[in-house]
């Protein structure tokens, strides 16, 4: 009787381990997001082997190519024109509101 229970517990434990390993294999091989065209869960950047410290502005190691620095981009002409339009419309709204306030003050003063 004891032998039967122990065998049942052992088989249950083994089946649980097999189920967990199957889930892990499926997770890492099938369900993981694609990285660099593969299904690897570990991100390996083959095309740019520059270390993170160098990319963050550190001193490049001997033999490494110089890291390109970011140049400040100039605003696009469409963006500046739309910003000017927004400023002009706000200015027009404020002047219109001021005119309404002035008319109200004149009406109250007449009474």
From Swiss-Prot:
Organism: Chlamydomonas reinhardtii
Composition skew (Polar residues), residue ranges: 70-83
Swiss-Prot/TrEMBL keywords: Chloroplast, Plastid
Subcellular locations according to the entry: Plastid, Chloroplast
Top-rank taxon, per record: Eukaryota
Major localization class: plastid
One Gene Ontology CC term in the entry: chloroplast
Region (Disordered): 66-94
Protein known as: Uncharacterized 12.2 kDa protein in 16S rRNA region
């Amino acid at each position: 009787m004891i032998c039967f229970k122990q065998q049942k517990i052992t088989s249950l434990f083994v089946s649980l381990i097999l189920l967990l390993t199957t889930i892990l294999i499926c997770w890492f091989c099938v369900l993981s997001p694609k990285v660099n065209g593969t299904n690897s869960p570990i991100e390996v950047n083959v095309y740019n082997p520059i270390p993170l410290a160098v990319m963050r502005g550190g001193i490049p190691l001997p033999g490494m190519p110089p890291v390109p620095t970011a140049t400040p981009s100039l605003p696009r002409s469409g963006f500046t024109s739309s910003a000017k339009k927004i400023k002009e419309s706000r200015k027009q709204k404020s002047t219109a509101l001021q005119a309404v306030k002035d008319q109200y003050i004149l009406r109250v003063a007449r009474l």
